[in-house]
Amino acid sequence: MGDREECLSTPQPPMSVVKSIELVLPEDRIYLAGSSIKGQVILTLNSTLVDPIVKVELVGRGYVEWSEEAGASCDYSRNVICNNKADYVHKTKTFPVEDNWLSAGSHTFDFHFNLPPRLPSTFTSKFGHVFYFVQASCMGREHILAKKRMYLLVQGTSTFHKETPFQNPLFVEAEEKVSYNCCRQGTVCLQIQMERNTFTPGEKVVFTTEINNQTSKCIKTVVFALYAHIQYEGFTPSAERRSRLDSSELLRQEANTPVTRFNTTKVVSTFNLPLLLSVSSSTQDGEIMHTRYELVTTVHLPWSLTSLKAKVPIIITSASVDSAICQLSEDGVLPVNPDHQN
């Protein structure tokens, strides 16, 4: 759900006073909302710089956009752009410079920022983006001399409660009466069992599927897939509210075990969730996008021109920093990000 990128420094003309500006941050780290970001700015000068402004910024933004047809019920129609945006965080630290000048050579500036406790996860799709970055810059008396930007991976937190009954449907069943060979009929029953259906990014999703084939045909294809359903919220140029639903397949497996005629087969499957995921959210959160997940098992019945599906809602949640540290401490493992300075 979003890759870390690094933008090149601003190109410098020959004999520029600034040779380079670099950002030093941990490689490929995923930051939990509410945690601390520590890093360094390394500024290298070709010559003395007077009255410099050296600063670093933490920025988080979201943006959604799509086009849709308007006036379809009238004699004419046209496409309108629907969009929306959100600002999640913008913090700036300006470094003190002794005597208001820096000599030629390298200068290192340490910084840290605290992420807000409630943030959406880094995300990108064809309709929306949520992104975070740290940007360092050096300004002279009149203009920016150099800047460098690095994008961050941020895992959002969730307020979904694990104990609500809706979030724990441990057993789902679907049944289909099918006709084949003109006059023959039979029944295919599909059951999914899970110990729980609430998970955090990086966890394993384990579930058991039972297929009861009461037909004289062999079932050869059973597909397991995890889908993300994302609803985007936006506005037209005339400020009319619009929404758009988009679905994507995150994970997919196919069972290699055929289900013979008049027989029952059990399949135990495991999905390894990505380390970075948008958390499940409701449409009442007031955000620019909302995410829900669904585990779908599909039995294809080509000889009857149909298929049978069973669906289980999956809840993706992520604890706050304080909760995560308490849990890790109980397990005897040191937290990844233990400092919470203001």
From Swiss-Prot:
Give the GO cellular component terms, alphabetically. Answer: cytoplasm; endosome; membrane; plasma membrane
Which GO annotations describe the biological process of this protein? cell differentiation; protein transport; spermatogenesis
In its keyword annotation, does this UniProt entry include Oxidoreductase? Answer: no
| Subcellular location as annotated | Membrane
Q: What keywords were assigned to this record?
A: Differentiation, Membrane, Spermatogenesis
Q: What is known about the tissue distribution of this protein?
A: Testis-enriched.
Family matches, as InterPro entries: Arrestin-like_C (IPR014752), Arrestin-like_N (IPR011021), Arrestin_C-like (IPR011022), Arrestin_domain-protein (IPR050357), Ig_E-set (IPR014756)
Task: Extract the PANTHER family matched here.
Answer: ARRESTIN DOMAIN CONTAINING PROTEIN, ARRESTIN DOMAIN-CONTAINING PROTEIN 5
Q: What does this protein do?
A: Plays an essential role in spermatogenesis. May be involved in the anchoring of the sperm head to the tail during spermatogenesis by affecting SEC22A-mediated SUN5 and NDC1 transport and localization.
What family name appears in the similarity comment?
Answer: Belongs to the arrestin family.
What this protein is called in its record is: Arrestin domain-containing protein 5
| Organismal lineage | Eukaryota, Metazoa, Chordata, Craniata, Vertebrata
